[in-house]
């Protein structure tokens, strides 16, 4: 098991690294050339700035049982399809039970924006978001004797 992170705009890199170190889990942070990252623990892979290059690299690397951190529903769907455990930066655990709805909502939002509409505002990140993320991450990485490894939603 390893943790693969779509790290370009990921606000929880420190939380991932802290917990991965604690449990001895390798972390791969994937970024494009417009970002720099060195946390002293993670393997950092830098890819071209081309559209979806980080996403494609991540999905090509993921294996069954890996943990994927992404806020991209398309990446989440492909990760689930490859047998990964997938969550976003706010602790939302993607699953077969919710990914179709999330992809459909993304599609509707894109249609509204293309037609000139607005779909909402982005809330400022909170301490509660970080806590929810860490709790969800720990569900996936704690040894079985300490807690569940698989969560069905």
Swiss-Prot record:
Transmembrane segments: none annotated. It comes from the Bacteria. PANTHER family: UPF0178 PROTEIN YAII. Belongs to the UPF0178 family. This is UPF0178 protein Ccel_2994. It comes from Ruminiclostridium cellulolyticum (strain ATCC 35319 / DSM 5812 / JCM 6584 / H10) (Clostridium cellulolyticum).
């Amino acid at each position: 098991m390893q943790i693969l992170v779509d790290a370009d705009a990921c606000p929880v890199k420190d939380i991932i690294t802290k917990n991965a170190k604690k449990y001895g889990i390798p972390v791969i942070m994937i970024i494009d050339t417009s970002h720099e990252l060195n946390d002293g623990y993670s393997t950092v892979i830098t890819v071209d700035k081309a559209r979806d290059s980080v996403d494609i690299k991540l999905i090509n690397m993921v294996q069954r049982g890996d943990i994927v951190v992404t806020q991209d529903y398309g990446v989440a769907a492909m990760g689930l399809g490859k047998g990964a455990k997938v969550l976003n930066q706010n602790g939302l655990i993607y699953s077969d039970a919710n990914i179709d709805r999330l992809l459909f909502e993304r599609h509707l939002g894109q249609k509204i924006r293309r037609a000139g509409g607005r779909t909402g505002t982005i809330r400022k990140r909170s301490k509660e978001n970080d806590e929810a993320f860490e709790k969800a991450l720990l569900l996936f990485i704690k040894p079985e004797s300490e807690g569940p490894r698989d969560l069905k939603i």
